[in-house]
Amino acid sequence: MTVMSGENVDEASAAPGHPQDGSYPRQADHDDHECCERVVINISGLRFETQLKTLAQFPNTLLGNPKKRMRYFDPLRNEYFFDRNRPSFDAILYYYQSGGRLRRPVNVPLDMFSEEIKFYELGEEAMEKFREDEGFIKEEERPLPEKEYQRQVWLLFEYPESSGPARVIAIVSVMVILISIVIFCLETLPELKDDKDFTGTVHRIDNTTVIYNSNIFTDPFFIVETLCIIWFSFELVVRFFACPSKTDFFKNIMNFIDIVAIIPYFITLGTEIAEQEGNQKGEQATSLAILRVIRLVRVFRIFKLSRHSKGLQILGQTLKASMRELGLLIFFLFIGVILFSSAVYFAEAEEAESHFSSIPDAFWWAVVSMTTVGYGDMYPVTIGGKIVGSLCAIAGVLTIALPVPVIVSNFNYFYHRETEGEEQAQLLHVSSPNLASDSDLSRRSSSTMSKSEYMEIEEDMNNSIAHYRQVNIRTANCTTANQNCVNKSKLLTDV
């Protein structure tokens, strides 16, 4: 990029920071001259011209810092040359002209524009603001414990990919969860179900009396359930004492699910012990009803699998990011249910064989019709009712289809972010002499590797690749004579 002023001056005086006579002008004259001083930026053959004070608004960036941009100065053409993407630079230059507003051109891919932001060193603040405008969701930082022992334990139970023992613990946890869910389902089979809820006197046909008392402590299902609860409790307690923040521990929805998964067991155990000691038969029916509700909560243990399943985590993040669209969907369905249930009731009011005795009774029909399920237990029989039913089904299809693209877009975003993270993690296993020393790599590949160290290795890899590309391009562009590569030891060419 060349530096030019309004008057014709030679190249030595035109370059910033290089006065012609070797003496430096006064500060006031320098400030007045800087207001009019212009620079030329050549982006792959397309020249842009702007004032130097425009670039100086952001002195920490590549173009705003004279020392940084001087590497790309071509003294023969008196300009700064960048072999970068042309359409992207329109937005980059507007960032300086507007004082910090950054908008991606519609004809530039998202990943390419992100690379341009990094190359021109616009900063993390500009990158975060750009990602927010593009709809990216900021990842929450997950700090690690400060103490080494707590960090080791936290990585074992929270980061299954950090080491071999952590993977073993994750596999054991998944197996225990699956066993608990299988036991929860099998104990309801008629051939395996025992009348554990019955305590009393049984009169046989031969006039003999048998007192039947169920003992839950000898039940095989209860024994297996106890073993599962021991593991769940151990895992929860260890993770609680090893977590970096006790307050954030209880704010995590997954930890709340872990607590809910073990509470029913202790309530059931306490109720059984109280009944055996007190023998209060009058409260037996009430306690059994409570136990049935509490046992139902055990089914939430299946959500514990999401801690070890990337697919379930992606699904949960998608639903969380799509709460607004899901809320609109429920609101539209609510309006449709009220509208069509009222319409079908009055359309079928004069029919003796009508299935709709009231508007609330027609709510069920409207819901299954708008969701295109159609059980067939309730259906219109008149012409007017069938017309209302047809409109209800069509409206349901349109209502449900509206928010689906947004939800799918959110799912694709989280899915690609997860897959890209896995690909970057796989690249960490590729050996390179420019990344780190052997001792450093062996230390980072141990069981103490944290998420911050993963990011550090990734940054080293990107820097080494960028250095390798710059060396190759300089070699390729400066091998012949009469090239623009003047003073090769100082001038660098970017790709």
UniProtKB/Swiss-Prot annotation:
Swiss-Prot/TrEMBL catalytic activity: K(+)(in) = K(+)(out)
Mechanisms controlling activity: Inhibited by 1.1 mM 4-aminopyridine (4-AP) and by 20 mM tetraethylammonium (TEA), but not by charybdotoxin (CTX). Inhibited by dendrotoxin (DTX).
Spans annotated as Tetramerization domain: 1-128
Region named S4-S5 linker: 310-323
Extracellular side of membrane: 187-220, 275-287, 346-359, 380-386
Membrane topology: Multi-pass membrane protein
Lipid-acceptor residues (S-palmitoyl cysteine): C243
Keywords of the record: Cell junction, Cell membrane, Cell projection, Cytoplasmic vesicle, Disease variant, Endoplasmic reticulum, Glycoprotein, Ion channel, Ion transport, Lipoprotein, Membrane, Palmitate, Phosphoprotein, Potassium, Potassium channel, Potassium transport, Synapse, Transmembrane, Transmembrane helix, Transport, Voltage-gated channel
Effect of I177N: Slows down N-type inactivation of heteromeric channels formed by KCNA1 and KCNA4
Region (Disordered): 1-30
Tissues with expression: Detected adjacent to nodes of Ranvier in juxtaparanodal zones in spinal cord nerve fibers, but also in paranodal regions in some myelinated spinal cord axons (at protein level). Detected in the islet of Langerhans.
Single GO MF descriptor: delayed rectifier potassium channel activity
Effect caused by changing C243A: Strongly decreases palmitoylation and alters current kinetics
Coiled coil: none
Known glycosylation sites: N207
Family: Belongs to the potassium channel family. A (Shaker) (TC 1.A.1.2) subfamily. Kv1.1/KCNA1 sub-subfamily.
Protein name: Potassium voltage-gated channel subfamily A member 1
Organism the protein comes from: Homo sapiens (Human)
Name of the coding gene: KCNA1
